[in-house]
């Protein structure tokens, strides 16, 4: 019960920390390790990077109303991630080609561990974790308004 209370009270901080780790990790991989960034990766970044600032400010101010603005970005980032992951893991899965001709193809795997963990998989994982914490923040907001 104490762990649940801790997660509920600090859910915005945990969501912000997840966004921060995802942002810094993607910047490290592209700027330091020089892993090429495809178009779908850029779309995922567009969804995740603003969350680092939004969730950081919201966590500092304990503004749980940010969930209404952050959750759509998280869901959109998840959709881009799962689409790219399916493109990488299922040969021939690409009904819609979202990659341009100047960037690397979105189905190319540039980094992989254990045979299934790729960069889009980590993006999916980060968005699922953020969704969990944002939903916890939303429901703790409802409880506070009811009291």
Swiss-Prot record:
Task: Tell me, in one coarse class, where this protein mainly resides.
Answer: membrane
Q: What lineage does UniProt assign to this protein's organism?
A: Bacteria, Pseudomonadati, Pseudomonadota, Gammaproteobacteria, Legionellales
Keyword vocabulary terms for this entry: Cell inner membrane, Cell membrane, Chaperone, Disulfide bond, Electron transport, Membrane, Oxidoreductase, Redox-active center, Transmembrane, Transmembrane helix, Transport
Query: Which Gene Ontology cellular component annotation is one that this UniProt entry carries?
Result: plasma membrane
Q: Where in the cell is it found?
A: Cell inner membrane
State the protein's name. Answer: Probable disulfide formation protein
Q: What is the documented function of this protein?
A: Required for disulfide bond formation in some proteins.
Provenance organism: Coxiella burnetii (strain CbuK_Q154)
State the superkingdom: Bacteria
GO process annotations (BP): protein folding
Membrane topology of the entry: Multi-pass membrane protein
| Segments crossing the lipid bilayer | 9-28, 43-62, 69-86, 115-138
Report the family membership: Belongs to the DsbB family. BdbC subfamily.
Note one Pfam family from the annotation: DsbB
For this protein, the record's SUPFAM superfamilies field holds: DsbB-like
Q: Name one GO molecular function term.
A: protein-disulfide reductase activity
Cysteine disulfide partners in this protein:
38-41, 99-106
